[in-house]
Structures are given as structure tokens and as C-alpha cells.
């Protein structure tokens, strides 16, 4: 695994926040409500965009009153009268699970700026405390870094996998345990009360208010950091016992050399997580050999014994017995196809150029995430299917006339449709060299 790049700015911030190097930071709230910090927080919230919360105020609305809003937030935090509003609960479909939904908690823009300002000051304090096993929501780390680590461990002989899932992690976080862990590094009582108020702000769905005695809302700016804080003792304890843990937020695996070691690792994980108030999902936690495959961060990783079940294509992507392969999991493929279907329905009142403009961000993001996997056949098939969807939308029927009036050369050339197979590094390099 490549070295994680160092970033001097967080170290400088950490020194400024805690110049004495004391184990705990005693004075932090004044650095949270510092006007420059609030301005930086607002710029981050504005760049991320997103919908408004329960007060109905949008990012554009906030921007019209930017100075007044930031002054108000500064005063409320300084005078210790700030109170967060409930988050707006928005049900969204679970990826790859038709008919199943999860709630996304959306704070108001005002509260989002406050959370980002708090995050700006907490992150430099806690980042040095996080374990090397943790890859989620950390500067210089990524899902692909986590996947590379797991891949190398499997290639090194650790082929038994503890494939685990946490039961309703974000919804079951115990506030007292989380705040106790924050208090190990932060002794500023006002900051601790501020975090507690954010956690207990509750939620609104329509006009129905629900109090929050546990959990941290998915969608809150500070939730990823808080999730890492809560699970850091788990990371340290597992690695301290010699287990090869890799974690990205609440998604984690342990690679082991034997089935017995994997069973012991699972027992240890269950015990450590229980002490943190976190449960494993009994139906979604298993021990498996890599030859049978497991899923991690949207990928299916499997040792080849048979050809992968991918549709035939003119582009060869064979599988050798005993070799290790990674490809998008079925739910990820289905989710992409559902998005394309929705955008290319025949009744969608857009021109082909407008459709491509809508499709491209989805195709580019999905393709770049999976382009280093074993996806030549899959990308080739998806490219052909997407072109046929565009033909169907344009000519209102599934007939082989589209290629005459709307050839692929026009779609990929003048119209700029993202070509998935062209995102694969070796193919992209070959095409670049030939032009």
C-alpha cells in the first residue's frame, strides 16, 4: 500500500488549537466561533450545496444574508445561546434494495455552517489519534486505499475473511459513550454541550417531531468524524491483538490466515463493539473464504475458480484459476442501470444533448470508481446498452435504425457521451497515444 501523504496544514492547526501539546484541549469554543472560521465553514457548505432543512432556507437564501447570518451565529455561539434545530428527515431508497428506505437527516443551512465550523476545529485534534486501519472520511485516504490494503493482505495469504455488518450503526450510537470519548481529548465543556445539543436536536418528518435519545443523523456534517471517534477504540484493540482490520466508516473486514483465526477475530470484534454500544448484524455477518467471494465498499472480491458470470463480449476478460479478481457488486450495477433508465425514459422531455449532459456526471463518477477492477466486458456491455437507451429515447422504439441517424461516433464525439470503457487506464492511455 502506498504511503499516506502528509498534510502540514492540519498539524499547524492542531498546534494553534493546542499550543502547549497538552493531552486535552481546554479552550476551543472561541476558535469555533472565530469569524474567519465561520466564513471558511460557510464557503464549504456553499460548495457542497444540498437541500435546506426544516426552516425552508436554501443555500441561495442564506447567501443573500450571508454577513447577517454569520454575525448571528458568531453571537449565539459566543454568548452560549445557540440551539440547533431538528434535522429534516427525508426518506431515500436503499441502494440495490427495492422497496426498502432509509432516512437522511438534513440540518438547516445555519446549523450546517455551525457543524462545519466545529468540524474545522475538531478534525486536527482527533486526526492524529485515529488508527491506520481507518480509511473513511480522512484526508489523504480513500476507499481505493482500503481496497488495496485488503487486496495485498489476501495476496499475502490471509484468505479467510470476517465479512461483517453493523446493525443500524448511525441510528444506534449511544450519546454518553460518544461524548465520553470526545471528552478524552476536549475538556471545553461548552464544546461538549454543543456536540450534545447537535446529537439531541431531534428530527422532523412533515409536522411530526421525534426526539433523538441515541444515534447521529446521516447527513449531518459532523457525523463521519463522530463515527470515527467512536470506532477508534475498536480499531486499536483489534490491531493491538494482531488482527488485520480495515475499516471505512462503518464498513469493515478482517483478513485472516485460517478459519480458526477468523472465528477468534469475530468473537473479539463482537465483544469490543458491544462495550462501545454497537451491535453486529447477525444475518449480515459471516466468515468466508475468498474463493467464495465477499463484498467490500461496493466491490465483489473473489478468487477465480470459474469464469465470472458476466455477459459475453468481443472484448476478452478471462479468469485464471486461483487468481484474485474484483468487480462491481450486482447492486451497484443495478443502481447505475436504474439511474440510466430513469433519465432516458421515452417521455422525458429532453433533447439527446441535454440527456447526455444529465447522464455524464453519473457515468463518469461510477466508471472512475470501478475502472481499475476487472470490468472490460461489463463496461463494453453497458456502453452498448446506454447507446441503445439513447436511440430508444430519440426514436421512440427499439429498432436498429438509431445507428444510421445517431451513430456512436456522434454520441461519443460531438455530443460528448462518457465512454465507460475509455475510462479504463490502459485503454485511455492507448487511445491517447494513438491521437
Where are these regions (language model features)?
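Core structural elements
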Residues: 33-38, 84-90, 94-96, 199, ...
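Conserved polymerase palm-domain catalytic core
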Residues: 76-91, 129-293
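Short, solvent-exposed helix-loop connector elements
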Residues: 103, 211-216, 323-325, 341-355, ...
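Duplex nucleic acid-engaging cores and interfaces of nucleic-acid transaction enzymes
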Residues: 109-110, 114, 151
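A conserved non-catalytic segment of reverse transcriptases
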Residues: 200, 276-351
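A glycine-rich phosphate-binding loop feature that marks nucleotide/adenosyl-phosphate handling sites
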Residues: 285-293, 359-362, 379-387, 403-410
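Extended C-terminal regions of large enzymes
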Residues: 385-389, 394-435
Amino acid at each position: 500500500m502506498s504511503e499516506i501523504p502528509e498534510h502540514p496544514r492540519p498539524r499547524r492547526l492542531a498546534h494553534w488549537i493546542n499550543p502547549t501539546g497538552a493531552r486535552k484541549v481546554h479552550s476551543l469554543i472561541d476558535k469555533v466561533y472565530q469569524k474567519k472560521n465561520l466564513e471558511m465553514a460557510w464557503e464549504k457548505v456553499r460548495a457542497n450545496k444540498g437541500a435546506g432543512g426544516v426552516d425552508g432556507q436554501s443555500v441561495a437564501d442564506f447567501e443573500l444574508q450571508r454577513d447577517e447570518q454569520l454575525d448571528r451565529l458568531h453571537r449565539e455561539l459566543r454568548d452560549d445561546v445557540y440551539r440547533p434545530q431538528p434535522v429534516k428527515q427525508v426518506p431515500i431508497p436503499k441502494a440495490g434494495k427495492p422497496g426498502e428506505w432509509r432516512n437522511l437527516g438534513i440540518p438547516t443551512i445555519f446549523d450546517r455552517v455551525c457543524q462545519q465550523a466545529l468540524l474545522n476545529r475538531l478534525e486536527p485534534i482527533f486526526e492524529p489519534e485515529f488508527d491506520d486501519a481507518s480509511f473513511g472520511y480522512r484526508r489523504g485516504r480513500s476507499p481505493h486505499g482500503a481496497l488495496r490494503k485488503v487486496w495485498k493482505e489476501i495476496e499475502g495469504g490471509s484468505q479467510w475473511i470476517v465479512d461483517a455488518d453493523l446493525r443500524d450503526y448511525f441510528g444506534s450510537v449511544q450519546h454518553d459513550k460518544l461524548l465520553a470519548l470526545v471528552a478524552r481529548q476536549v475538556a471545553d465543556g461548552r464544546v461538549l454541550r454543543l456536540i450534545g445539543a447537535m446529537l439531541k436536536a431531534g428530527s422532523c418528518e412533515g409536522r411530526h417531531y421525534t426526539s433523538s435519545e441515541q444515534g447521529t443523523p446521516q447527513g449531518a456534517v459532523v457525523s463521519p468524524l463522530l463515527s470515527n471517534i467512536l470506532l477508534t477504540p475498536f480499531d486499536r484493540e483489534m490491531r493491538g491483538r494482531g488482527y488485520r482490520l480495515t475499516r471505512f466508516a462503518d464498513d469493515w473486514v478482517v483478513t485472516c490466515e485460517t478459519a480458526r483465526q477468523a472465528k477468534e477475530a469475530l468473537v473479539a470484534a463482537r465483544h469490543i463493539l458491544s462495550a462501545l454500544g454497537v451491535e453486529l448484524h447477525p444475518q449480515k455477518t459471516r466468515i468466508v473464504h475468498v474463493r467464495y467471494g465477499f463484498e467490500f465498499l461496493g466491490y465483489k472480491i473473489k478468487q477465480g475458480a470459474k469464469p465470472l458470470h458476466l455477459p459475453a463480449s468481443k472484448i476478452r476478460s478471462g479468469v485464471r484459476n486461483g487468481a484474485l479478481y474484483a468487480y462491481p457488486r450486482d447492486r451497484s450495477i443495478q443502481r447505475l442501470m436504474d439511474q440510466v433508465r430513469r433519465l432516458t425514459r421515452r417521455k422525458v422531455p429532453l433533447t439527446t444533448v441535454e440527456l447526455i449532459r444529465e447522464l455524464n456526471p453519473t457515468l463518469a463518477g461510477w466508471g472512475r470508481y470501478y475502472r481499475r477492477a476487472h470490468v472490460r466486458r461489463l463496461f463494453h456491455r453497458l456502453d452498448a446498452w446506454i447507446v441503445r437507451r439513447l436511440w430508444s429515447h430519440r426514436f421512440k422504439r427499439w429498432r436498429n435504425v438509431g445507428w444510421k441517424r445517431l451513430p456512436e461516433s456522434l454520441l461519443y464525439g460531438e455530443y460528448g457521451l462518457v465512454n465507460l470503457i475509455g475510462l479504463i487506464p490502459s485503454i485511455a492511455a492507448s487511445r491517447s497515444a494513438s491521437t
